[in-house]
Amino acid sequence: MAQLVGSDEIESFRMDLAEIGRSLRSSFRGQSSSFRSNSALSASQKDDAVDEENMLAWAAIERLPTFDRLRSSLFEEINGNDANVKRKRVTDVTKLGALERHVFIEKMIKHIEHDNLQLLHKIRKRIDKVGVELPTVEVRYKNLTIEAECELVHGKPLPTLWNSLKSITMNLARLPGLQSELAKIKILNDVSGVIKPGRMTLLLGPPGCGKTSLLKALSGNLDKSLKVSGEISYNGYKLEEFVPQKTSAYVSQNDLHIPEMTVRETLDYSSRFQGVGSRAEIMTDLSRREKEAGVVPDPDIDTYMKAISIEGQKKNLQTDYILKILGLDICADTLVGDAMRRGISGGQKKRLTTGELIVGPIKALFMDEISNGLDSSTTYQIVACLQQLAHITDATILVSLLQPAPETFDLFDDIILMAEGKILYHGPRNSALEFFESCGFKCPERKGVADFLQEVTSKKDQAQYWHGTKETYKFVSVDMLSRKFKESPYRKKLNEELSVPYDNSRSHRNSITFRDYSLPKWELFRACMSREFLLMKRNSFIYIFKTVQLAIIASITMTVFLRTRMDTDLVHANYYLGALFYALIILLVDGFPELSMTITRLAVFYKQSELCFYPAWAYTIPATILKIPLSLLESVIWASMTYYVIGFSPEAGRFFRQLLLLFAVHMTSISMFRFLASVCRTIVASTAAGGLSILFVLCFSGFIIPRPSMPIWLKWGFWISPLTYGEIGLAVNEFLAPRWQKTLPTNTSIGNEVLESRGLNFDGYFYWISVCALFGFTILFNIGFTLALTFLKAPGSRAIISTDKYSQIEGSSDSIDKADAAENSKATMDSHERAGRMVLPFEPLSLVFQDVQYYVDTPAAMTELGFTQKRLQLLSDITGALRPGILTALMGVSGAGKTTLLDVLAGRKTTGYVEGEIKVGGYPKVQETFARVSGYCEQTDIHSPQITVEESVIFSAWLRLHPQIDSKTKYEFVKEVIETIELDGIKGMLVGMPGVSGLSTEQRKRLTIAVELVANPSIIFMDEPTTGLDARSAAIVMRAVKNVADTGRTIVCTIHQPSIDIFEAFDELILLKTGGRMIYWGHLGRNSCKMIEYFEGISCVPKIKNNHNPATWMLEVTSTSSEADISIDFAEVYKNSALHKNNEELVKKLSFPPAGSKDLHFPTRFSQNGWGQFKTCFWKQYWSYWRSPSYNLMRSLHMLFASLVSGLLFWDKGKKLDNQQSVFSVFGAMFTAVIFCGINNSSSVLPYVTTERSVLYRERFAGMYASWAYALAQVAIEIPYLLAQALAFTVITYPMIGYYWSAYKVFWYFYSMFCTLLYFTYLGMMLVSMTPSFPVAAILQSSFYTMFNLFAGFLMPKAQIPKWWIWFYYLTPTSWTLNGMLTSQYGDIEKEITVFQEKKTVAAFLGDYFGFHHNQLPIVAFVLIAYPLVFASLFAFFIGKLNFQRR
């Protein structure tokens, strides 16, 4: 396919259009005069009448005021009666319906590349006709250098607990000699250039060369922690002088979107936030000039231009246009989805990322690897549209691509080639080869120029391109190439341009944006409010679940604190206080899920905030306002269900005052947790902070320990705890009521006595002070939430580098390059030899599939659009075979069903309905045995983040290789695979989280392949193994894959953008079309001759051009638009072909087992025995935990903080027992420690296990281990960490509180706490295993916490719990913990104390009031260790039986 648009072609095309128009008008006049028949006359009269109507309508528009005229156009009526009559009506373009917008865009753009070109040409012609000037942006960068600070460490640069603790200590100490060693690494090194308007520039270079940093720097999105020198300017303005984020856009390589929104909604809101920019002013100027000149525009072009120029539209015609040209119209109403929620494909997400920015009015685009996951045909189509945008509208576009096909490469005007932070070439595309020929390198025939440019800088690939005749080859380093470029005429020309300052007077006034945001404040607020409301509707399940859960807890609470069982006396006053305090706990903890819900949205917020879509306040205020009705609803439910049933004071006014206070508490709670999430910004840190906050506000609320009993130096905590005011307000409201005014013998009322004993003796007006204080806290937290999002950026981590690696980087000079080059040819040969030696014993197997169909239940969105079928078919009549030693490519456009077919064949589908026959080696496929002989490289690279590359491969080898292979051979094989896939240079790196830390996209992809290859499978499925890789990395991977296939293995790969070399490395091709139908299966042949011969044999299919990539040509000629153009269904053509008949014969032959063969059978389901599985899983968990400071260090620090707070707050109260209140205080110390240290551990483990669960699903599908082995390892690795926590708690709190010293009592204290931490942690694991997502697990967890609080025996002692709930008391683990702690400490103490105005021993009081008896401690000890065993067993059961991954 030739280049679509050049400047000469544009001018020629304009002249042709004018000539065609004149000819058509002349022809029309001639033909009109020649027709004399009645029917023709009638038709002519009808057309004339319509034309006259249209002209009258346009005249009416012209008479309208300017505001209305700019919103009105002639819009073609959708008339089903007479399609030939093009009657138009005056329409307000802001009120076009969804159907009208759809029909309009379908009419304007049928064939995307051609019709989009026509549309842009017509727009430009209209603009030029009246002399309106378009804004343009020229971007210059001069001597740009970017440096990053890295922390130097000795040994492996891994974030272990020890390294993290040492770093924290050093940063806190700030002592000379203790500060971290820092090193500066150059990311970009003195680069200069000009990105010109009206030209397409391609940015090439290997991963890690600085492409992303350059794009971010030029677009003004660079991280503030990086040191930047040099100058960047737009039209002569420096970056500090305007708002670069509104003048240009950076399209990230990471696809971050809100999963609950549809594709259309994502683009609609993006369009709304970005505004219309200069379009409105251009349209106003254009309309005025046309009116003055008497020019009547094309009605369709007028409609389109007006529709996209009006600000603040909720539904925009521009969205429909972008959906169409990006091929997203077929999934416009599909949810975006995420890892756990079904949505659009990876390729569609990548296109959505592009569409999200180009839907706006931006004139300068910096696009980072926008083709990852897209087939070459789709990539070509998108880049062609971008080229048209650049050439016709004078946009400035710089695009980074990894593997551009030759046809896509030819669409660009300029090339920038980078390596190691330096620019090796920046100049015209046509001159790139000439420059490298001057350096001694020549691009071979049938080699893509882009692939050549990327490989010529590589040490291992450069030699094959050497063409110097006068001297022998010597490695030409990056520094040498950079110097040669600086001496070239291309760089000299750049220097000349940069030396001449840009004339600001030439800059269009709308080229540069000086406003931070596109919309007025009110419009920003409205847009954010409507989006937040939409997301609340989409997450309605969570809110309904929370509300129902609260109602259930309220019903339990009111039947525990039943009014018929409680009197108005001093004893029962404690129970009423307990009920009030419990209400506060419930509404406080109910806000806890706000943490996770806020955190999950932050990544998208930070992206859109950096793009200046909206300010933080526009995001936070709607989030706050829309929670008010929910908060009010939950408060009403709680108060109305519990108030009168429990038996609080019956006055209606007091009921409403309690309701108001509970509402204020709930608002404070959700505001506080939102604020903590915005400050901490990661789920682990915010969970820890949330736990500490709950601990603090409850301990200082005045209930657990009364204010008079607090140490004097800590009483300030009472006044800054929000819950204090909730406690004061509720207590004053209740105990100053008339029914509590009975006088005691001490001449004080019962109510006043109760308030005074708790330090809550305040006057009635303190209720209103409390309400105001709580709303004040709410406002304060929301202001903090806004400020945190305004000033704190997305979380990152300082890079860590070893001293050895830093020395290597600093010493990388030509001398080192020459030394490395001397070994170059030898290393290349070794690479080929290593690949060929992967010959561990295996059984060659074929895979046959016949008439495979795959259906899913029809999505609700499609049903709403009128789709009547109950099932949606994604694969239709797929028949084929995969054979040993044959490398098969599975191809098709994005969304054709490639991954779906791979999942079906591999047995990875968890939803839907599969029909048809699949056989392995001639025998029906049995998934359990098939998993042992197959490997699956998934499209999403899912790995444990806290282990190294080498450990990931070793883990796979240990569990999947045959047990008879000895350890030495396994290690050698692992080493071989690592070297073959070229991971040896990074084998000590942590895998990390995608897009956050650790490996890059291409390194992660290669690791996925290595993990599967090391299993030595007979059949390997690879889903897009080269996506995200540059040309050289893709060649490395495919060379390794080809060598594996040559050993006799069966391999099938889906592939999107193969170069000619990679495509022709395959032996066979399976090609699917949209709808999951097969249109080709057969041999490729030498130079793809068989495939080309087949398609060229079909009538109307255009012939392939010389040196054209066969893969791109094939996808282009079989695309949906091509099918429509030539009226052919390629699936039907294939079904009726001789090739199909031959293939059916082959399938029949392979469907029967070969003579003497046996069905697959293994004596055991897994390769390793149970002990081997557990040992290997435990080994992985050991390293993962040791390298997870965000998890283990945070919860350990929480334990230290909680222990210190508890020790200080209850300082030396352990032996000072005088009355019942002193016993309650000590019991409160135990209660808070048990509940909140346990809650923190349970909450902290949720995100960790959730992350590892995704890895478990992949590894379980691969048949690596039994679920129980994974679960047991996960459970066992927690024990030493929890042991250390319990020990630290005991060592700190025991002496500070001053308990009785005896080995027996100390041991019981430690044992109770250790068992508590165990069962809380295992509870968190269990909840993750039985729920689909982290937020649901967090909400369900909160209900467990509330029950553990209510039935712990602290708020309501066992003796007072109604008999219909006493079973729940015995079922609650915290009741046994507190029993063990309090009874072991005081159950044998015979000291007399005053209890409710009578004398009793401590032991007797414990027995009478709490029901705790010293002789029952052996039973308590048994029950305490039973709970962790039960929760751990349930975790193992659910993690094995349930699978929430939807595929």
Curated annotation (Swiss-Prot):
According to the record, what induces this protein's expression?
By iron deficiency, methyl jasmonate (MeJA), salicylic acid (SA), 1-naphthalene acetic acid (1-NAA), ethanol, and cembrene, a macrocyclic diterpene.
Limits of the ABC transporter domain: 173-445, 847-1099
Give yes or no: UniProt keyword Repeat: yes
The record's subcellular location field reads:
Membrane
Q: In which residues is ATP 2 bound? A: 892-899
One GO location term (cellular component): plasma membrane
The name this protein goes by in its record:
Pleiotropic drug resistance protein 3
According to its UniProt entry, this protein's organism is: Nicotiana tabacum (Common tobacco)
